[in-house]
Amino acid sequence: MKIGVPKEIKPQEHRIGLTPESVKTLISEGHEVLVENNGGFEAGFENDQYTSVGAKIVDKAEDIFNDADIIVKVKEPQAGEVKMIRENQIVYTYLHLAAAKELTEGLIKSKSVCIAYETVTDNNGRLPLLAPMSAVAGRMSVQAGAHCLEKNQNGRGLLLGGAPGVEGGTVVILGGGVVGENAAVIATGMRAKVHIVDKSEARLKQLVEMFGDKIIPEQSDKIDLNKLVAEADLLIGGVLIPGAEAPKLVTKPMLKLMKRGSVIVDVAIDQGGCVETSKPTTHGDPTFIIDDVVHYCVANMPGGVPRTSTIALNTATLPHLIKIANKGYAKALSDDKHLLAGLNVCKGQVTYKAVADVFGYDYVDPLKTL
């Protein structure tokens, strides 16, 4: 197959769909790879690293979309890219459709085959293609939040890790999944006071086994969330419902309970955010203030560390891409129920129930579209 890797065009997005090492593997399997000129430059991958393993460098994204059987990206197709997607073309990338009605409509009209990294599953019901970026975003969330707490960023003027004789700040993490766990790694390392909120008692026990008394576990149905939000210097939103819009756990009235200059980092913003007042921002303009609370809602946080993120992502996405390229999408999907779970839109039909439900589309069994 002919595999195309366009340069990412979302603002301040510096990752790329494939590393040179991944390209080398695909070419060894007999496939052709087209990479847009300087597509990997910001992630530290030069054109000659791609050509040295057999890739063809293409000057225009249009030519990649015109020629490739499979488009491999990182972020969801932007408006200009959606217009170039062809019927029956395979699009393999993060999509986050439950928070993107216009994109969903565009992909339906394109009659393409859209496989979303974030809904591919594994034998344990986890999301292995989402996990690497969730880990990166979780770790970055505390770094970003700590920076936003500085006075010149309109924060409280508080050093999250404290100082000799001075207590550190309080971090409240909503969600004990991959984002929450990795946020806790950094927050506990900074010696902040860390609360982790999750609905699963079993998951909280796992986190206590990992972190010991460095965290305070909070079961969501047994706490007063208002009180906990009021204590937070830094609130991390890391709640996920696979493929669906994130639940709004923190409402606008709850902001009035928070300290002036406290910070919210809503990692769930890709899926609409778990804070009512959240709206997507960019690395270039990452924050806004509502009711004296700083909101950091960058929708592509891992794009700020593109080299680490690209390598981590490829480790997870490449094995499935090889299956798709070697077998064709229909056989690859029908042979693997976990990859099939990634099929969100196929040839004009919505094949992921959470997306169909949120926008009122008819849900079609993905196997019936192959």
Question: Locations of the language-model features?
Answer:
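Rossmann-like adenosine-cofactor binding region
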Residues: 209-291
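Glycine-rich phosphate/diphosphate-binding loop of Rossmann-like nucleotide-binding domains
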Residues: 6-7, 11-44, 152-240, 287
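An N-terminal-biased, well-structured beta-alpha scaffold segment characteristic
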Residues: 2-106, 110
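Residue-level detector of alpha-helix initiation sites
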Residues: 76, 136, 177-178
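Glycine/serine-rich phosphate-binding loop and adjoining beta1-alpha1 elements at the start
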Residues: 2, 8, 79-169, 298-300
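Short glycine-/small-residue-rich Rossmann-like dinucleotide-binding loops
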Residues: 69, 75-76, 95-96, 221, ...
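Adenosine-phosphate binding glycine-rich loop
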Residues: 118-159, 269, 274-370
